[in-house]
Amino acid sequence: AGDPDAGQKVFLKCAACHKIGPGAKNGVGPSLNGVANRKAGQAEGFAYSDANKNSGLTWDEATFKEYITAPQKKVPGTKMTFPGLPNEADRDNIWAYLSQFKADGSK
């Protein structure tokens, strides 16, 4: 199990494109509120790549961690340019952080 506080620090690598928490809106990337167990390509109002929309993925813990290890490898054609998180502890911690947020941005 990851550490949400450590995950918040890891999220700084993501925050240029993604927002989370109360009032978070889509930016360069979709808002990540409620990402846990959401189907890929479903954040309201975000223009996803066809690759992401049609991936058939659901963001459970295992799928998210596999994706964030190397996004372009997991979903070829994704618009996400982030190279990935090679460190397993970082992946555990960011999932612990992100998965605590509900769709409305509350914890």
Swiss-Prot record:
Gene3D superfamilies: Cytochrome c-like domain
Binding residues for heme c: C14, C17, H18, M80
Signal peptide: none
KW Iron (keyword) present: yes
Keywords, in A-Z order: Electron transport, Heme, Iron, Metal-binding, Photosynthesis, Transport
PTM comment: Binds 1 heme c group covalently per subunit.
Function text: Cytochrome c2 is found mainly in purple, non-sulfur, photosynthetic bacteria where it functions as the electron donor to the oxidized bacteriochlorophyll in the photophosphorylation pathway. However, it may also have a role in the respiratory chain and is found in some non-photosynthetic bacteria.
Family the UniProt entry places it in: Belongs to the cytochrome c family.
Protein name: Cytochrome c2
Organism the protein comes from: Rhodoblastus acidophilus (Rhodopseudomonas acidophila)
